[in-house]
A protein has these predicted regions:
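Catalytic active-site module of serine/aspartate enzymes centered on a nucleophile-bearing elbow/loop
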Residues: 359-388
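Short beta-strand/loop motif that positions the catalytic acidic residue
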Residues: 318, 324-326
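Conserved acidic catalytic loop of the alpha/beta-hydrolase fold
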Residues: 163, 170-172, 176-219
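Conserved alpha/beta-hydrolase "acid-adjacent" motif
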Residues: 229, 331-338
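N-terminal cap/lid segment of alpha/beta-hydrolase-fold proteins
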Residues: 23-80
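Short, surface-exposed "cap/lid" segments of acyl-processing enzymes
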Residues: 77-163, 167
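Fungal secretory targeting signals
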Residues: 1-21
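Gly/Ala-rich beta-loop-alpha elbow adjacent to hydrolase catalytic centers
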Residues: 221-230
Length: 388
């Protein structure tokens, strides 16, 4: 009897709740202070896996490998935006990058949910909750030392390894070991498989299945090593891709820069085949390369397709809006324009380059979505998406 009374009371309360304004039952939202708040946006969370399959483990049993973890977040008061957003992290990271920031501030996933979007966050294959089966694709996992993170991401001004590093001001705290925010960030870094071809192929396969499951065109947003994943997923599922946002994607085309100058990415932006017209069967001969002069001081030369023969076209991407975002102080600042030029040369005429410094957003490094002014940047992306 007591249970029935409780159930009736709960039902009545739930019936009343439908008439209450949005936010009822949750703590009031604090002033955003440019996005830095102490609590995340309430959401409905579920998770699932896509891709992968069973393989023989060599001893009479089977294991499951190459699967990708996906976390789905929905606004508690319902989705009000028609385009889902898929968030893809970079090397040595997991999907936690887009949850709350290392300083405790509200992350981009929370902002997108609050703005009414259906959000999907992945852990790339072999990363985080997407388990790697030892021996497949690499003999052992790789890691980034704390020193590398300091030098390239969080305390770049102290090392000054590229000209734009002097502009870095937005990382909260010192960006060095022992600082509370740095320690929170570095403790979230994970091992990774240093095999770009295997990584890209498995993410492409799993990502295509993710888009099939979502069932309608999405915005693919990727960062750094994960920044080229929107390209390869969109190439596999162009009809389910509405737009691509590339946050300082791996680059520049055909070569490394800043920390090395070795040849890389045989297909221009990727290590695996993507769809060109005319078809590329051997990238070493079919993609004729040409070096173009640097656009100015403190920038690198670009290796792009040659002017003759006519540059091959990325036919599955030519009609897609693409936004490439570069921060003012990152090691990408000297070369991201090469990636933009490569895409435009390959027929992607809707490619735009958002250089944050030129847009009046100053002081950011490579992990700008975690930095003090991250909400200011997210609002620019929100406006771009809404204008599609």
């Amino acid at each position: 009897m007591q249970f029935l009374r409780f159930a009736a009371a709960a039902a009545a309360l739930l019936g009343q709740a439908a008439a209450f304004p949005p936010g009822f039952g949750f703590p009031p939202t604090q002033p955003e202070r440019d996005g830095c708040v102490d609590s995340e946006t309430p959401y409905i969370r579920s998770y699932f896996y896509v891709g992968g399959g069973y393989v023989d483990d060599g001893s009479g049993g089977h294991i499951f490998r190459d699967q990708m973890y996906v976390e789905k977040l929905l606004p508690v008061h319902g989705v009000s935006k028609g385009t889902p957003i898929v968030l893809i992290h970079g090397q040595a990271q997991t999907g936690s990058n887009f949850l709350n920031k290392p300083d405790g501030g509200r992350g981009w996933a929370s902002h997108f949910v609050r703005q009414g979007y259906e959000v999907y966050i992945v852990d790339q294959t072999f990363r985080g909750r997407s388990a790697w089966m030892p021996g497949y694709g690499a003999s052992k996992p790789s890691t980034y030392s704390a020193e590398i993170i300091q030098q390239r991401f969080t305390a770049v001004k102290e090392y000054n390894l590229w000209p734009q590093a002097v502009n870095h001001t937005q990382w909260p705290g010192t960006g060095m070991m022992g600082d509370e925010v740095f320690d929170a960030f570095y403790s979230s870094n994970v091992q990774f498989i240093n095999n770009a071809t295997y990584q890209q192929k498995t993410v492409q396969d799993a990502g295509a299945l993710l888009l099939d499951k979502i069932g309608k065109p999405v915005v693919l947003l990727g960062h750094s090593q994960g920044g080229i994943m929107p390209i390869i997923i969109a190439d596999a599922r162009p009809e389910l891709t509405k737009a691509l946002i590339l946050l300082e994607p791996t680059g520049p085309p055909f070569q490394e820069a800043i920390f090395s100058n070795k040849s890389s990415r045989a297909y221009g932006l990727t290590d695996i085949p993507v769809t060109y017209s005319p078809e590329v069967t051997d990238p070493t001969t079919d993609l004729v390369q040409q070096t173009y002069p640097a656009k100015g001081e403190n920038f690198v030369q670009c290796v792009l397709q040659a002017e003759e023969p006519a540059p091959r076209q990325l036919v599955n991407l030519v009609d897609k809006p693409i936004l490439l975002v570069t921060s003012e102080a990152s090691y990408h600042a000297p070369y991201d324009h090469c990636t933009v030029e490569f895409l435009q040369q390959a027929g992607c005429s809707k490619t735009e380059h958002l250089e944050l410094g030129e847009a009046g957003i100053h002081g950011n490094g490579h992990m700008f979505f975690m930095e003090k002014n991250s909400y200011q940047i997210q609002k620019v992306l929100r406006d771009w998406i809404q204008a599609l």
